[in-house]
Amino acid sequence: MILTVKPLQGKECNVQVTEDEKVSTVKELVSERLNIPASQQRLLYKGKALADEHRLSDYSIGPEAKLNLVVRPAGERSGVAGMASSSSAVGGVWQTLSTVLAKHFSPADAAKVQEQLVKDYERSLRQLSMDDIERLAGRLLHPDSEGMDTSYMD
Protein backbone atom coordinates (compact mmCIF):
# COMPACT_ATOMS: atom_id res chain seq x y z
CA MET A 1 0.00 0.00 0.00
CA ILE A 2 1.09 3.58 -0.52
CA LEU A 3 1.08 6.09 2.34
CA THR A 4 1.44 9.83 1.98
CA VAL A 5 3.62 11.51 4.59
CA LYS A 6 3.15 15.27 4.95
CA PRO A 7 5.51 17.38 7.05
CA LEU A 8 3.84 20.35 8.73
CA GLN A 9 6.05 22.59 6.61
CA GLY A 10 7.44 21.08 3.47
CA LYS A 11 6.80 18.78 0.58
CA GLU A 12 4.97 15.50 1.10
CA CYS A 13 6.29 12.13 -0.03
CA ASN A 14 4.83 8.71 -0.71
CA VAL A 15 6.16 5.46 0.76
CA GLN A 16 5.32 1.92 -0.28
CA VAL A 17 4.74 -0.34 2.75
CA THR A 18 2.64 -3.25 3.96
CA GLU A 19 0.20 -3.02 6.86
CA ASP A 20 2.53 -5.28 8.86
CA GLU A 21 5.41 -2.78 8.71
CA LYS A 22 6.55 -1.19 11.94
CA VAL A 23 6.34 2.56 12.34
CA SER A 24 10.14 2.64 12.69
CA THR A 25 10.42 1.19 9.16
CA VAL A 26 8.17 3.94 7.80
CA LYS A 27 10.40 6.52 9.50
CA GLU A 28 13.46 5.02 7.80
CA LEU A 29 11.76 5.24 4.39
CA VAL A 30 10.76 8.85 5.08
CA SER A 31 14.32 9.57 6.18
CA GLU A 32 15.62 8.34 2.81
CA ARG A 33 13.14 10.46 0.84
CA LEU A 34 13.07 13.69 2.86
CA ASN A 35 16.54 13.60 4.47
CA ILE A 36 15.07 13.93 7.96
CA PRO A 37 16.70 11.62 10.53
CA ALA A 38 14.26 9.04 11.90
CA SER A 39 15.17 10.13 15.44
CA GLN A 40 13.77 13.61 14.71
CA GLN A 41 10.50 12.34 13.23
CA ARG A 42 7.18 12.08 14.97
CA LEU A 43 4.47 10.53 12.83
CA LEU A 44 0.80 11.25 13.55
CA TYR A 45 -2.31 9.55 12.23
CA LYS A 46 -5.67 11.15 12.92
CA GLY A 47 -4.05 13.23 15.67
CA LYS A 48 -2.41 10.30 17.46
CA ALA A 49 1.34 9.86 17.73
CA LEU A 50 2.58 6.54 16.35
CA ALA A 51 4.97 4.47 18.49
CA ASP A 52 8.02 3.08 16.68
CA GLU A 53 7.56 -0.48 17.93
CA HIS A 54 3.95 -0.75 16.73
CA ARG A 55 2.79 -1.95 13.33
CA LEU A 56 0.67 0.15 10.99
CA SER A 57 -2.12 -2.40 11.39
CA ASP A 58 -2.18 -1.66 15.14
CA TYR A 59 -3.52 1.78 14.23
CA SER A 60 -5.83 0.52 11.45
CA ILE A 61 -3.82 2.46 8.87
CA GLY A 62 -4.95 1.40 5.43
CA PRO A 63 -4.03 2.08 1.81
CA GLU A 64 -3.72 5.72 0.74
CA ALA A 65 -3.74 6.98 4.32
CA LYS A 66 -2.10 10.31 5.07
CA LEU A 67 0.34 10.61 7.97
CA ASN A 68 1.43 13.95 9.37
CA LEU A 69 5.09 14.44 10.20
CA VAL A 70 6.35 16.68 12.97
CA VAL A 71 10.09 17.29 12.88
CA ARG A 72 11.69 17.67 16.29
CA PRO A 73 14.83 19.74 16.72
CA ALA A 74 18.00 17.65 17.01
CA GLY A 75 18.62 16.43 20.56
CA GLU A 76 15.04 16.81 21.78
CA ARG A 77 13.66 13.86 23.74
CA SER A 78 11.19 11.63 21.95
CA GLY A 79 7.59 12.05 22.96
CA VAL A 80 5.63 12.10 26.19
CA ALA A 81 6.37 8.46 26.98
CA GLY A 82 10.12 9.01 26.59
CA MET A 83 10.08 12.00 28.93
CA ALA A 84 7.85 10.27 31.47
CA SER A 85 9.78 7.02 31.65
CA SER A 86 13.12 8.80 32.11
CA SER A 87 11.75 11.25 34.67
CA SER A 88 12.95 10.78 38.23
CA ALA A 89 9.43 11.61 39.46
CA VAL A 90 7.97 8.66 37.58
CA GLY A 91 10.86 6.48 38.75
CA GLY A 92 10.05 7.52 42.30
CA VAL A 93 6.41 6.56 41.82
CA TRP A 94 7.37 3.08 40.61
CA GLN A 95 9.76 2.66 43.56
CA THR A 96 7.05 3.72 46.01
CA LEU A 97 4.58 1.39 44.34
CA SER A 98 7.08 -1.46 44.61
CA THR A 99 7.43 -0.83 48.34
CA VAL A 100 3.65 -0.79 48.86
CA LEU A 101 3.11 -3.93 46.79
CA ALA A 102 5.84 -5.75 48.72
CA LYS A 103 3.84 -5.24 51.92
CA HIS A 104 0.73 -6.87 50.48
CA PHE A 105 1.93 -9.50 47.99
CA SER A 106 4.57 -12.17 47.64
CA PRO A 107 7.66 -10.94 45.75
CA ALA A 108 6.63 -12.83 42.60
CA ASP A 109 3.05 -11.53 42.69
CA ALA A 110 4.19 -7.98 43.46
CA ALA A 111 6.50 -8.07 40.44
CA LYS A 112 3.68 -9.32 38.19
CA VAL A 113 1.27 -6.64 39.44
CA GLN A 114 3.84 -3.88 38.98
CA GLU A 115 4.79 -5.12 35.52
CA GLN A 116 1.14 -5.04 34.44
CA LEU A 117 0.63 -1.56 35.91
CA VAL A 118 3.67 -0.26 34.02
CA LYS A 119 2.38 -1.79 30.77
CA ASP A 120 -1.08 -0.28 31.30
CA TYR A 121 0.44 3.12 32.11
CA GLU A 122 2.65 3.13 29.01
CA ARG A 123 -0.24 1.95 26.81
CA SER A 124 -2.42 4.76 28.15
CA LEU A 125 0.26 7.33 27.35
CA ARG A 126 0.68 5.99 23.81
CA GLN A 127 -3.07 6.24 23.20
CA LEU A 128 -3.28 9.93 24.10
CA SER A 129 -4.05 12.06 21.06
CA MET A 130 -2.71 15.58 20.63
CA ASP A 131 -6.23 16.83 21.38
CA ASP A 132 -6.24 14.87 24.65
CA ILE A 133 -2.90 16.39 25.64
CA GLU A 134 -4.04 19.92 24.76
CA ARG A 135 -7.25 19.53 26.80
CA LEU A 136 -5.34 18.12 29.77
CA ALA A 137 -2.73 20.88 29.60
CA GLY A 138 -5.44 23.54 29.38
CA ARG A 139 -7.23 22.16 32.41
CA LEU A 140 -4.05 21.90 34.44
CA LEU A 141 -2.73 25.33 33.45
CA HIS A 142 -6.09 27.11 33.83
CA PRO A 143 -8.07 25.22 36.49
CA ASP A 144 -10.18 28.27 37.43
CA SER A 145 -11.21 29.24 33.89
CA GLU A 146 -14.92 29.87 33.56
CA GLY A 147 -16.75 27.88 30.96
CA MET A 148 -14.34 25.01 31.30
CA ASP A 149 -15.86 21.66 32.12
CA THR A 150 -14.27 20.45 35.34
CA SER A 151 -16.88 17.83 36.20
CA TYR A 152 -14.36 15.07 35.49
CA MET A 153 -12.40 16.25 38.55
CA ASP A 154 -15.16 15.39 41.03
Swiss-Prot record:
Subcellular compartments: Cytoplasm, Cytosol
Keyword annotations of the record: Cytoplasm, Transport
Protein name: Ubiquitin-like protein 4A-A
Record flagged with keyword Transport: yes
Gene: ubl4aa
Pfam families, per the entry: Tugs, ubiquitin
GO biological process, one term: post-translational protein targeting to endoplasmic reticulum membrane
Subunit structure: Component of the BAT3 complex.
CDD domains assigned: Ubl_UBL4A_like
Domain Ubiquitin-like: 1-76
SUPFAM superfamilies linked: Ubiquitin-like
UniProt GO MF annotations: protein-folding chaperone binding
Main location as per UniProt: cytoplasm
Matches recorded under InterPro entries: Ubiquitin-like_dom (IPR000626), Ubiquitin-like_domsf (IPR029071), Ubiquitin_CS (IPR019954), Ubiquitin_dom (IPR019956), Ubl4_C_TUGS (IPR041421), UBL4A-like (IPR047154), Ubl_UBL4A-like (IPR044724)
Cited function: Component of the BAT3 complex, a multiprotein complex involved in the post-translational delivery of tail-anchored (TA) membrane proteins to the endoplasmic reticulum membrane. TA membrane proteins, also named type II transmembrane proteins, contain a single C-terminal transmembrane region.
A single Gene Ontology CC term: BAT3 complex
